[in-house]
Amino acid sequence: MSVPTVLQKILARKAEEVAERRARVNLAEVERLARSADAPRGFANALLERAKRKEPAVIAEIKKASPSKGVLREHFVPAEIARSYEAGGAACLSVLTDVDFFQGADAYLKEARAACALPVIRKDFMIDPYQIVEARAIGADCILLIVSALDDVLMAELAATAKSVGLDVLVEVHDGTELERALKTLDTPLVGINNRNLHTFEVSLETTLDLLPEIPRDRLVVTESGILNRADVELMEVSEVYAFLVGEAFMRADDPGLELKRLFFQERGGVVLGADPD
């Protein structure tokens, strides 16, 4: 299967970017920074604890823009958004650090993490062990591995590097073939199902529902993309999916944390359910 055009462009640029970063700061220095970073906050555990109680385990995303939608939020202050998400009941944060396609930055992750007590995933296109060590150096608690962007050997190498520096791994799949590869190659408990097709950028929540029966019960399913309203949340919860990665619905809201609380915790006659941020 050929790599989709948008993803191919992103990956080609990412390879150049990694080379540029390595030329600026060598691996030994990044490793030193990683060793001196604050201790990881336990990204996987934060999600697993919520899901075990059958409460929404929300990874709330801090994302200024995307290739398909352009700028999502003009007033973009990561620290402010992070505090809002924490108050709204998020379990974890996701921060985009890709510069060229998502207008992200390493600084956004640092600012967001410093402003709250939540664990943070570095949302980027990971293709080199250097990026994994770098993620820990800038304060990330977890990294994303996108199966469609990696072969099995590299995927395993990146996961091993993550483990060596204390990072959790969220592996992202979109179809049955990718899921099979992920389950065979990695032992991470976190399996993300991207409802957005990276070939077409179309979104369907059926992607998560179709793949659910193939996922072992000891893995936590994180449904990603396309959760826009209460009906979407209930569709997942009735299928015992309690972990969600949501960005666009929050980024377009005046108060992202309030929108999170409304979408996930305010229901059944207005009663707020489980909205404590711990």
UniProtKB/Swiss-Prot annotation:
<dbReference type="GO" id="GO:0000162">
    <property type="term" value="P:L-tryptophan biosynthetic process"/>
</dbReference>
<keyword id="KW-0028">Amino-acid biosynthesis</keyword>
<dbReference type="GO" id="GO:0004425">
    <property type="term" value="F:indole-3-glycerol-phosphate synthase activity"/>
</dbReference>
<dbReference type="InterPro" id="IPR013785">
    <property type="entry name" value="Aldolase_TIM"/>
</dbReference>
<dbReference type="InterPro" id="IPR011060">
    <property type="entry name" value="RibuloseP-bd_barrel"/>
</dbReference>
<dbReference type="InterPro" id="IPR013798">
    <property type="entry name" value="Indole-3-glycerol_P_synth_dom"/>
</dbReference>
<comment type="pathway">
    <text>Amino-acid biosynthesis; L-tryptophan biosynthesis; L-tryptophan from chorismate: step 4/5.</text>
</comment>
<dbReference type="Pfam" id="PF00218">
    <property type="entry name" value="IGPS"/>
</dbReference>
<keyword id="KW-0210">Decarboxylase</keyword>
<keyword id="KW-0822">Tryptophan biosynthesis</keyword>
<keyword id="KW-0456">Lyase</keyword>
<dbReference type="InterPro" id="IPR045186">
    <property type="entry name" value="Indole-3-glycerol_P_synth"/>
</dbReference>
<comment type="similarity">
    <text>Belongs to the TrpC family.</text>
</comment>
<dbReference type="GO" id="GO:0004640">
    <property type="term" value="F:phosphoribosylanthranilate isomerase activity"/>
</dbReference>
<dbReference type="InterPro" id="IPR001468">
    <property type="entry name" value="Indole-3-GlycerolPSynthase_CS"/>
</dbReference>
<protein>
    <recommendedName>
        <fullName>Indole-3-glycerol phosphate synthase</fullName>
        <ecNumber>4.1.1.48</ecNumber>
    </recommendedName>
</protein>
<keyword id="KW-0057">Aromatic amino acid biosynthesis</keyword>
